[in-house]
Amino acid sequence: MIIYATAVQTINSFVRLESLKEVYGLIWIFVPIFSLILGIITGVLVIVWLEREISAGIQQRIGPEYAGPLGILQALADGTKLLFKENLRPSRGNPPLFSIGPSIAVISILLSYSVIPFSNHLVLADLNIGIFLWIAISSIAPIGLLMSGYGSNNKYSFLGGLRAAAQSISYEIPLTLCVLSISLLSNSLSTVDIVEAQSKYGFWGWNLWRQPIGFIIFLISSLAECERLPFDLPEAEEELIAGYQTEYSGIKFGLFYVASYLNLLISSLFVTVLYLGGWNISIPYISILELFQRDQIFGTTIGIFITLAKTYLFLFISIATRWTLPRLRMDQLLNLGWKFLLPISLGNLLLTTSFQLFSL
């Protein structure tokens, strides 16, 4: 009996140990996800602060300066204010569509961050079709905007939702064709493989030099996808008050505000990954892969810093464009997408395909 009791206790202890291992395994699954979300939130707060400071400098005025040092906590203060504001609903609107629309817009953009490689193999989901997963997920966001416009039962909101859907369709196709050209050059649809393909020749191996036409088209299309000036027709204040956001208040309005900057950040990250070499530094005799092999923590940290430095450099261009170019008319916007960018991007894809065939 004593031997039997001892055996039972031993088995129970092993069962508890296995249970603890399963619990720790589940915890470690969520650690990268929460770390990525925390990093995204921090990045959005920095973008908001940068845009306000750069805009203040362009307009020769003083930007935010009271909330925290240099006003860096102003975005956090604005978010807290929106969190405690009342959520109003249109009396004749469609409550399910009105409530779900902002969530769809934010979640679809957040999922796109899962395929971004911030450093050497530091990616949440290294998929073989990572780049097309981003395109597929990002095409869901306009559905949320259209639902918000329709569910508001407001003519300005509905027109804003229709404009957002039309604009997204018009510029999604040229953007996809540019991504196809990059995939042909890299022989892969994985974001990690695309970055590694650019690291073979250093600075001159960046796709920026191999695909200059595609880079310009991707830049214009990504600005249109983010609905930034001069492509902010879905929320044109002079015409539509606030577009599909007109009837929103409180945290739901804040979700649209966050979605705008999340989209801007993800577009800049994809420009870095697809055209600017990702985490690779273009200094002779210095390789991130060698640094990573010597010291993984140091190499990973340097890779993250390089990726974010390139991303925020591109963000400066996007922010400066807002105060440089006037807003297009709706017919001009659609003509630019369908009559100019689409044929040029298609021709660029055919040239890239021909080059790859002749180089075999």
Curated annotation (Swiss-Prot):
Segment forming the signal sequence: none
Enzyme Commission code: 7.1.1.-
Domain of life: Eukaryota
Chief place where the protein resides: plastid
Swiss-Prot/TrEMBL keywords: Chloroplast, Membrane, NAD, NADP, Plastid, Plastoquinone, Quinone, Thylakoid, Translocase, Transmembrane, Transmembrane helix
Entry's family note: Belongs to the complex I subunit 1 family.
Protein name stated in the entry: NAD(P)H-quinone oxidoreductase subunit 1, chloroplastic
Name of encoding gene: ndhA
